[in-house]
A protein has these predicted regions:
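Cofactor-pocket helix-loop regions in the catalytic cores of large enzyme subunits
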Residues: 1-244
C-alpha cells in the first residue's frame, strides 16, 4: 500500500491461478463483502450441488469432514435411521459426484437452466426457462420438493464461473432460509478479480502499460492462452518477477 501511495501510477492487482472471481463478485453484490461463502455441511440434510466439487479443492476449503458427519445413518426418536441426501448435477465425473446418492450428468449450460428453473418455481415466477425433457423435469420437481421439505437444512451449491448462476444459487438459499450457509463466516482464500486482470491486457494493447512487477506468481503458466500474457511480458519496457 505504501508503494502505491508513493507512486500514483502503480496499480496493485491480485489474481488466483484457479479463478473464483464470479463467486467473489456475486457474494459482494448479494452481501456487500468480497469473499467466498462458507458452508456448514454438518447441518445439511439435503445437498444439491451443481458442478461444485466440494469434496475436492472447491474454493480452497475442506468440506469432507463436515460432509461425512451426516452421511452416517442416525437413529431418530421413532427408531428410524436417517442420513443426509446428496444430489450431484455435473458434466464430468468428480470426487463429489462419485459419492452422491444420485448423480445427474448434464452439460454446464443446462445446469444453469436448472438453477433458473428451481428459482422460478420457488419464487412462483413465470419468466422464461428453456424446456426440459419430461424425465428430467420430473426429477427436478422432486428435487425442489426435497429442498422445500428440508428448508433451513437444505442447501444449493454452485460451482460455475458465472456471476448470474452464483447469484441465483445465493437467492435460492435465501428463499430456503438455509442455515447451512454460514451467515457470520466467510473465506478469504481467494481475492482475484478477473476484470482488473483484463484491464492490464487492455492497458498493454493501448500502450499505457509501462512495466509489470510480479510476486510469487507465474501468469504465463497459469493464465489462459487467450490472454497471451507471454506476449505482454515480451513487449513491456520493464518486467520483474520475485519468486521463492
Amino acid at each position: 500500500e505504501s508503494f502505491t501511495k508513493k507512486f500514483k501510477n502503480v496499480k496493485h492487482i491480485e489474481y488466483d491461478a484457479v479463478s473464483e472471481s464470479a463467486v467473489l463478485d456475486a457474494h459482494e453484490i448479494m452481501y456487500g463483502v468480497r469473499a467466498l461463502p462458507f458452508y456448514n455441511l454438518d447441518k445439511a440434510n439435503f445437498i444439491l450441488s451443481l458442478g461444485a466439487d466440494f469434496l475436492g479443492d472447491w474454493m480452497g476449503s475442506s468440506y469432507d469432514k463436515d460432509y461425512v458427519k451426516n452421511r452416517v445413518p442416525k437413529k431418530k426418536n421413532n427408531g428410524k435411521a436417517k442420513m443426509s441426501r446428496h444430489i450431484q448435477i455435473e458434466s464430468n465425473m468428480s470426487i463429489t459426484g462419485s459419492n452422491a446418492d444420485v448423480r445427474i450428468p448434464l452439460k454446464p449450460t443446462r445446469q444453469k437452466h436448472v438453477l433458473a428453473y428451481i428459482y422460478s418455481k420457488l419464487e412462483s415466477n413465470s419468466f422464461s426457462v428453456p424446456d426440459f425433457e419430461d424425465s428430467l423435469k420430473q426429477k427436478l420437481d422432486l428435487l425442489i420438493d426435497e429442498l422445500v421439505s428440508n428448508g433451513k437444512n437444505s442447501v444449493v451449491l454452485c460451482g460455475h464461473d458465472d456471476i448470474d448462476s452464483q447469484i441465483i444459487s445465493f437467492r435460492i438459499n435465501e428463499i430456503l432460509k438455509s442455515e447451512v450457509k454460514n451467515r457470520s463466516k466467510v473465506s478469504l482464500l481467494r481475492k482475484g478479480d478477473d476484470k482488473k486482470l483484463q484491464n492490464i491486457i487492455k492497458d498493454h494493447e493501448n500502450g499505457t502499460l509501462g512495466g509489470i512487477i510480479m510476486s510469487g506468481v507465474n501468469p504465463v503458466y497459469s493464465l489462459p492462452e487467450t490472454m497471451d500474457f507471454k506476449s505482454l511480458l515480451s513487449n513491456v519496457d520493464f518486467s520483474v518477477n520475485f519468486s521463492m
